[in-house]
C-alpha cells in the first residue's frame, strides 16, 4: 500500500454510520471475524490516528464489509455512503458551508458540477486527489487516491461508499436521482477510480 492520506474525522463519521446501519452488535461481530482491532467499533478511537493510518483503516473496514456481506455488501455500502453525505455537510468548515449555500441558489443545471467539486474537496486527502470533469453532457469524478481501493484486488469496482456519496450529494443539490457508474477502479489495476454521472438526456 502507498502512503495515501484520509481524514480521521471522515473515518470516524464512516464508522458511526456503519454502526447505525448494521447495529452495534453486528458491527462488532464483523470486526471480530475480520480480525481487526475491536476498539475500531468505537468511533472515538480514530481521533488518535494520523492521516495515513486512517486511509489504511478505511480500506480495511470496507474490505471486511465486502467479505462479511458478500453480494449484499454493495447495497449496505451504498446506503452508508448516502448517509455519510449529510455528516460531511454538518462537519464542513465555514468555507464549505458557504459553498453549499451558494450551490443551492444556483440554477439546477449549474448545481451538479459545483456539488461534485464540493464533494471532491470534502473527501480529498490532498489537493488534486479528487477531480471533476465534463464529458459532453455527462460528468466524471476521478478519485486519483481512492484509499478504499488502495492495495485491494478485485475483478469488479468496489468503491460503493463514493458512489453513494455522489448519488446523495446530487440528490441534495437538485432533488433528482442520477445514474452513477464506477467505470474504472484501482482495485482492478487502474490508476484511478472513475465515476461517470449520466446527466444528459
Language-model features: locations:
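N-terminal accessory segment detector
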Residues: 1-138, 147-157, 186-192, 201
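Short Pro/Gly-enriched beta-strand edge/turn motifs at strand-loop
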Residues: 112-114, 176-179
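Residues forming anionic-ligand binding surfaces in small-molecule and nucleic-acid pockets
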Residues: 143-145
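Short, low-complexity, polar/charged sequence segments that are solvent-exposed and flexible
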Residues: 159-163, 198-201
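Active-site helix/loop of acyl-thioester processing domains in fatty-acid/polyketide metabolism
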Residues: 160-176
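C-terminal, beta-strand-rich globular interaction domains
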Residues: 171, 177-201
Amino acid at each position: 500500500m502507498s502512503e495515501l492520506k484520509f481524514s480521521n474525522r471522515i473515518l470516524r463519521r464512516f464508522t458511526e454510520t456503519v454502526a447505525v446501519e448494521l447495529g452495534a452488535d453486528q458491527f462488532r461481530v464483523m470486526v471480530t471475524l475480520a480480525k481487526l482491532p475491536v476498539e475500531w467499533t468505537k468511533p472515538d478511537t480514530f481521533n488518535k490516528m494520523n492521516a495515513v493510518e486512517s486511509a489504511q483503516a478505511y480500506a480495511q473496514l470496507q474490505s471486511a464489509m465486502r467479505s462479511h456481506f458478500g453480494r449484499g455488501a454493495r447495497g449496505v455500502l451504498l446506503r452508508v455512503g448516502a448517509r455519510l453525505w449529510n455528516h460531511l455537510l454538518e462537519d464542513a468548515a465555514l468555507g464549505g458551508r458557504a459553498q453549499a449555500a451558494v450551490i443551492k441558489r444556483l440554477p439546477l443545471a449549474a448545481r451538479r458540477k459545483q456539488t461534485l467539486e464540493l464533494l471532491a474537496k470534502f473527501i480529498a486527502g490532498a489537493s488534486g486527489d479528487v477531480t471533476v470533469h465534463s464529458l459532453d453532457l455527462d460528468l466524471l469524478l476521478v478519485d486519483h487516491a481512492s484509499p478504499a481501493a488502495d492495495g485491494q484486488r478485485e475483478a469488479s469496482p468496489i468503491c460503493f461508499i463514493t458512489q453513494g456519496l455522489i448519488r446523495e450529494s446530487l440528490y441534495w443539490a437538485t432533488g433528482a436521482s442520477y445514474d452513477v457508474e464506477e467505470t474504472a477502479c484501482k482495485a482492478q489495476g487502474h490508476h484511478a477510480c472513475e465515476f461517470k454521472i449520466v446527466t444528459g438526456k
